[in-house]
Amino acid sequence: MRGGIRAADEIIAFKVPVYGDNSGKSDMIDDTRSEHDLLGNRDIPADAYYGVHTLRAVENFPITGIPISIYPELISALAAIKQAAALSNMELGLLDKVRGDAIIAACEEIRAGRLHDQFVVDVIQGGAGTSTNMNANEVIANRALEILGHGKGDYGHLHPNEQVNMSQSTNDVYPTALKIATYHGVFHLIDAMAVLRKGFERKADEFKDVLKMGRTQLQDAVPMTLGQEFSTYGVMIGEDEERLREAALLICEINMGATAIGTGIASHPDYARLVCLHLVAITGMPLVTAVNLIEATQDCGSFVQLSGVLKRVAVKISKICNDLRLLSSGPRAGLNEINLPAVQAGSSIMPGKVNPVIPEVVNQVAFEVIGNDLTVTFAAEAGQLQLNAFEPIIAHSLFKSVSHMREACLTLEKRCVSGITANRERLRAYVENSIGLVTALNPYIGYANATAVAVEAHATGRSVYDLVLEKGLLPAATLAAILHPDVLTKPQSMLIRE
C-alpha cells in the first residue's frame, strides 16, 4: 500500500471470537471477562480492548467480513475526535485531569497506529455508525484503564460512555470522522492525479511534432499532433484536481457539538467551539463548525458533492483509457497509432497476443466509482427527519472510490503512460492518405477544388497529397509548408487566392 485510505480488498479474512452469554458456566472463564449492557451479560475475550457493544455489533452485522480497521485514517480520525473532546471537557472542568490524560494518551497511541486490529465492527452496519463509535469508545476506555493501572472492563474507574464519549453523540462523531478521513484521502488522490497528469504532459512534449489525424465520431476530421492529444489528457486531469480541492473544502464543515440532533443537548455551551479548535490543532485541517448544527446533522450534501466530483474524475480517466485502447488497437488490423507497454501475455489460446490490460483495469475502477456514486446518492436521499442512518455505506463507498481511483492513477502512469511510444510513420501515412486533409487545404485551393480532390481521392484511393500536386493546385514546396505541423494544427493567416 502506497499510503492513504486502504483498499477494502486488502482484507483476506476477518473473524472475531463470539462467546455465549453468562447463563452457563464458561469453560474459558480465565480467558474471558464479563461485561453488561441493557440486554444482559456477555463474555468478552480477556485480551480484547473492545467490549460488549462491539461484540454485539459483530454478531449483528456479518455483512462484508471487512472490519473498519481496513480504513486506518477513519480509526485515526475517531481517535483525534475523542482526544479533542477530552481536551475540551477538561478545559471546561467536566473531566478530571487523571482520566482525561489517560484518554488522551490512548488516543495518541491509536493515532500512531496501535490497536487498530481492535476495531472489528463491519464497515456496513445499522445504527447510523453507533457501532463504530462504541467500538472506539470501548477500545480507548480499556487502553486508558490499563494506563491508569486497572484491568480491561473495570468501567467503574473510567467508562466508555461517561468519560470517553462525554459531550458527544454518534451523530456528530461519525460524520466528522468520515469527513476527516476522507479529506486526507482526497489529497492523496490529488497527488496521484498529479503524477498521472505530469506523465501525460511529458508524453505531450515528446510527441509535439508528431502529426496525426484527429477524428470526430470515429471518422477522419482534421490534422493535429499527437502531442496535442496527450496534452489534452493532462488538462482534463488537472481540471479535476481543482474540483477535488473545492469539494474537500466543503467537507471541512463539521457538526461537533450537535450531539443527538443538532440542539447540543448534554453538552456545554462552549464545547462546540472548543472541540473544533482542538480538532484543527490535532488534524491540521481548516475545520469550521457549521452555523446551523441541526441542518448539518441531517444533511449529507457535502458527501454527495464529493462523490459527484469523484464520478467526474472516473468518467474522464475512463474516457482517456478508451482512447488509449483504441489508438493502440491492432497491431495489424487496427489503428496502431501508439504502442502501449506489454506487461503480460494476453491470451491462453492465442500465442503472441498482448492486451491493453492496464487501461482495462482502470476502466473497471471507473465503473466502480460511478456505481459508488449512485450508492451515495441513494443513501443521502434516504435520510429521514433529523438524521441520516445510512452514513456507513456512504463512508464505505467514498473510501473505496478515493482509494481505488488513487491506485488506478498511479498504476496507469507507471505501467502504461510512461512507456507509450508513437508509430510515427503510420501516423504520417494516415495524414497523407486522409481525405480529411482537404479541410486544411480549402483556404489555399478553394472549396470547389477541395471538393473535387476529395471526391477523386475517395473514388480512386489515391492520396490528397498526390492529387493536389498532379493537378498543379499547389507547388510541392508550398504543399510541404502547409502540411507542417505548426501550420496544420494552429490558426494561420490565410493565402489570398486570385
What are these regions (language model features)?
Residues 24-498:
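Conserved, well-structured ligand/cofactor-binding cores
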